[in-house]
Amino acid sequence: MKSVSLLKLVTILILMAGMTHASDEKPPNILFIFTDDHALNAISAYGGPLAKVAPTPHLDRIAKEGMLFKHCLVSNSICAPSRAVVLTGKYSHLNGQLTNKDMFDGSQQTVSKLLKKAGYQTAIVGKWHLKSTPTGFDHFEVLKGQGQYYNPLLFTNGKNVKHTGYTTDIITDQSLKWLETRNADKPFFLMTQHKAPHGRWEPALRHLEVFEDMEIPEPPTLFDNYAGRTTAPAQHKMGIADHMGPHRLMFQYSSKFTPEQFKIFDGHFRSRNEAFEKLNLQGKARTRWNYQRYIKNYLRCVKAVDENVGRLLEYLDDNGLANNTVVIYSSDQGFWLGEHGWFDKRWMYEESLHTPLIVRWPGQIQPDTTNTDLVSNLDFAQTFLDIAGTKQPGDMQGLALTPLLRGKTPANWRKTHYYHYYEAGGHGVPVHYGVTDGRHKLIRFPDDTLDAWEFFDLKKDPNEMQSRYGDPQYTRTIAALKEELNRLRKQYQVENFENP
């Protein structure tokens, strides 16, 4: 009997020791690095046409040490609404942020509030772009409005603080300062949110000469004439040929430079602009020049982002935080890099719909893996909460990505994705909504002046040049997608909702 009792005592002590050890383990830190308008094709880990000419080694490192998602789709491809989706885990019609013009309701439930309640120290540094004051954060330093690329104002502690330097560097500087001064006894949730590579694309002084002596490859659809689809895409106002204007092409500047900065920046562009004007280029030659000026400045802005991602990763390494910090890199949406002759986003077409998502989670993710499931920015909030080990509210509409991160896609994972864009008239893009299963895509333009559908077979037509809506060979597929579209609108509580 004594030996049995002794065995029981030893067993209890072992279990208690295990429980004590488990309770001593901190939940993982979460570092969410979020950029603005970062196209998949501008991250070399995605292997696109720009991968060799514009490598992104630090972003590629996250992919090499973690998981790259090939099909992360946004729910509403425009800046402020996408940010609201990330914070709330709800579609735009439920979180109230339909367009860039709306003010975010900070009184509602957000992931930052829930993580703070769960014991996390929370901070956001960089681009906010939601008009209201951030809530749910122990610390915030956010750009005023859209922000500028040089010498930004950061709003914190009730006042705007002027900083001198390049904004991408400064956002990282301030993120690192917060990491240095945070309460090290608590896990942290840090949202480092860059303005870059949003237009108007003003590179760092150190990058002005990068790509200078090369021709960046043109996309095959640069001179799209928009035939084969509804009239909607032809009504755009985001053409590289006609709509970039002097600020986007660096004939005028948006930032307020110091005299020293202006001398270097203007010194680079002025002589090149004068040489261009003497050429008097017209037609396709002018479009090609515009494209080279645009894409080089865009990629220069991305280069600064990549360097600063490297600074954050280095800090985690040097301070023993890398093994217990989940690093998540994404953007508010994709972006046009000349495809269909465009810049900007908004459309449900592929380059705008897809956003990058790369995650590193040591000990949980098999390094250098790729996921091809349909995931969404709608999933981010619940993923943060699940990583933290805290409850996911039932009114959130996404799915936690943690099973996928561990390499085990649930059998009932989503097979389709619902999209809805509301900001009518922005860059000439009409209200539209739709559904995709990754192979096929159905888009509805409900406006009275259009009242039209588009349907694409993405396997046969990956560039979405020819709508096959009405084609008899796709009758069953289109009918099934319409049924699925109606089901999703009911599931997401939008069945009776149209643009106001």
Give a label for each model feature.
Residues 459:
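Residues forming the ATP-binding cleft of Hanks-type serine/threonine protein kinase domains
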Residues 1-10:
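Bacterial N-terminal signal peptides that target proteins for export
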Residues 2, 14, 18-453, 462-500:
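Formylglycine-dependent sulfatase
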